[in-house]
Every structure is written in structure tokens, then in C-alpha cells.
């Protein structure tokens, strides 16, 4: 999965950067994808533990807190 690069650039600019290189966009996108997959994996475990097949927002929120 690849996150769209334009929103990644906006995230960096919203953090205060005036200009953002393509390499910086790609590096942040990769980091976010890796972290997102880790969070999603934990959220799936939480849903399964609760006896559900559906991952809820509360599973994701708890996964973020636990990691």
C-alpha cells in the first residue's frame, strides 16, 4: 500500500516547513505506513479478543494508546 504523497507534503508543511523535498515526503509516507500497519495489527488483535470480526474505531484508538 502506498499513501498519496501530496497529503504527506501538507502534513510536513503544516508542521512549519516552507519547502519539502520529494525524498522527505517519501520517507514520512514510509514511516506512516509502517506505523499504521503496526497499529492496524494491534487493532485486529483487540477486535478478535473481543470476539468481533469488525475492527471498530475504539480498537484503533486503544491500539494507539497501547503502542
Swiss-Prot record:
Function (record text): Binds and compact DNA (95 to 150 base pairs) to form nucleosome-like structures that contain positive DNA supercoils. Increases the resistance of DNA to thermal denaturation (in vitro).
Record text on subunit structure and interactions: Homodimer or heterodimer with another histone. Dimers then assemble into higher oligomers, with the DNA wrapped around the protein core.
Organism: Methanobacterium formicicum
Protein name in the entry: Archaeal histone B
Keyword Lyase set for record: no
CDD domains: HFD_archaea_histone-like
GO molecular function: DNA binding; protein heterodimerization activity
Phylogenetic lineage: Archaea, Methanobacteriati, Methanobacteriota, Methanomada group, Methanobacteria
Family the entry assigns: Belongs to the archaeal histone HMF family.
Keywords: Chromosome, Cytoplasm, DNA-binding
Localization of this protein: Cytoplasm; Chromosome
Matching SUPFAM superfamilies: Histone-fold (SSF47113)
Amino acid at each position: 500500500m502506498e499513501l498519496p504523497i501530496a497529503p504527506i507534503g501538507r502534513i510536513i508543511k503544516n508542521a512549519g516547513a516552507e519547502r519539502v523535498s520529494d525524498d522527505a515526503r517519501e520517507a514520512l509516507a514510509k514511516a506512516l505506513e509502517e506505523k499504521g500497519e503496526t497499529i492496524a495489527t494491534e487493532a485486529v488483535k483487540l477486535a478478535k479478543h473481543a470476539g468481533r470480526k469488525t475492527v471498530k474505531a475504539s480498537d484503533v484508538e486503544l491500539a494507539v494508546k497501547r503502542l
